[in-house]
Amino acid sequence: MSELTALTIAEARDKLKAKAITATELTDAYLSAIDAANDAINAYVAVTHDQARSMAKASDERIAKGEAGALEGIPLGVKDLFATKGVHTQACSHILDGFKPEYESTVTANLWADGAVMLGKLNMDEFAMGSSNETSYYGPVKNPWRAKGSNADLVPGGSSGGSAAAVAAHLCAGATATDTGGSIRQPAAFTGTVGIKPTYGRVSRWGTVAFASSLDQAGPIARDVRDAAILMKSMASLDLKDTTSVDLPVPDYEAALGRSVKGMKIGIPREYRVDGMPGEIEELWQKGIQYLKDAGAEIVDISLPHTKYALPAYYIVAPAEASSNLARYDGVRYGLRVPGKDIADMYEQTRAAGFGKEVKRRIMIGTYVLSAGYYDAYYLRAQKVRTLIKKDFEDVFAKGVDAILTPATPSAAFSLADEVLANDPVKMYLNDIFTVIVNMAGLPGIAVPAGLNGQGLPLGLQLIGRPFEEETLFQAAHVIEQAAGRFTPAKWW
């Protein structure tokens, strides 16, 4: 990790402003780091060398003229779910082979408008379906962290595994990511990085490949809370092209850092103490409670009675929406096309060859729960449960609770190619046990590293906030970060 790539976004921003470094030097340092490390970590599926250099050159020119944007010259990685004009956008699926969109997603357009530099597209679980980044057509991503005294490869979490691994390994200053059931927060927790899923509607979904439209939200993964706040300010906007986009001013999230949490009411949900939760997770949770208490926050016990139904309801709603969204991939207009004896056969052959195993599984579950005989029994019921989950949170917030503290994941990062998890999808789905509820309720949630386990692997805590009160999350997460310190993996790649 070079001196330049070790800079946080906030530090790089200050050095660029002071003309102590140039955007070109910073970008070249990241491109060299990617070229040296990507064979080992597999975080990038496309590296845009020429585009990055020309964007950095334009940034240097704007800085020289005194016209620098909020992210001028900051090199970022982009999850392969965001449309980037003329650049590989395949949701890491075989079915989108060769697809290069003619348009730019709103999130990336916002970042480029603020002067950020694109380093390339980041690996992810296919169509964002997965918790380990093992379902990608481009192969798994390796976590930059390893257990003490071990050379075994670990997963970086998913679906934004490439984003989290690239940030942790200093292969980008920060990254875009998406979260449908935990895909920002779980990989952030597994890699010692910070990830925030904003309130549903805070960040535009336009130009982002859809998985489950009522749950998907884009957000940043960054090295620390300040960097996440800086990125989120640029990513969030009102967008008339997204009907779920909310017309609320975007606050200066960075300004929330350092504000006192004295008197802030933090809820601890008793339902999150799940059976079989490792002692190290319980210990971490207690540590987080103490950090906030020491900073003057008031800790209160709360109840979210419908928590246990969140995961099963999520795995009905998300596949149902996915089966509908993924019906558009048929090999006719773009992507992979496998010839067939007639049009119906061509559709079948293309979809059979183009989708991976996990995506097929979820399409089939979704089609099943939406089918005539089962719609009421499954889908309708799951939506009713979702309403009850939302009400649980509304009741808690009505009692004056400002934020809720929970573990981010039920364990540290697990081994790559774990046979038990590979053969039992439900065990894999349990990785999202603490995160899916936030998507079901449309609330903001942040994962912040809070310590290392006995094997030296990072563990994260999650803070859940009221709708559109991300500032409170940044404020409280910053307190945890200041108390716990920061965590960087030892370089092996």
Swiss-Prot record:
NCBIfam families, sorted: gatA
Task performed by this protein: Allows the formation of correctly charged Gln-tRNA(Gln) through the transamidation of misacylated Glu-tRNA(Gln) in organisms which lack glutaminyl-tRNA synthetase. The reaction takes place in the presence of glutamine and ATP through an activated gamma-phospho-Glu-tRNA(Gln).
EC top class named in words: ligase
Active site: K79 (charge relay system), S159 (charge relay system), S183 (acyl-ester intermediate)
Family designation: Belongs to the amidase family. GatA subfamily.
Gene Ontology molecular function, alphabetical: ATP binding; glutaminyl-tRNA synthase (glutamine-hydrolyzing) activity
This protein's name: Glutamyl-tRNA(Gln) amidotransferase subunit A
GO cellular component: glutamyl-tRNA(Gln) amidotransferase complex
Gene name of this polypeptide: gatA
Catalytic reactions on record: L-glutamyl-tRNA(Gln) + L-glutamine + ATP + H2O = L-glutaminyl-tRNA(Gln) + L-glutamate + ADP + phosphate + H(+)
Subunit structure: Heterotrimer of A, B and C subunits.
Coiled-coil portions: none
EC number: 6.3.5.7
InterPro entries linked to this entry: Amidase, Amidase_CS, Amidase_dom, AS_sf, GatA
GO BP, sorted A to Z: translation
Family annotation (PANTHER family): GLUTAMYL-TRNA(GLN) AMIDOTRANSFERASE SUBUNIT A (PTHR11895:SF151), TRANSAMIDASE (PTHR11895)
Annotated keywords: ATP-binding, Ligase, Nucleotide-binding, Protein biosynthesis
Gene3D superfamilies, alphabetized: Amidase signature (AS) domain
Tree of life domain: Bacteria
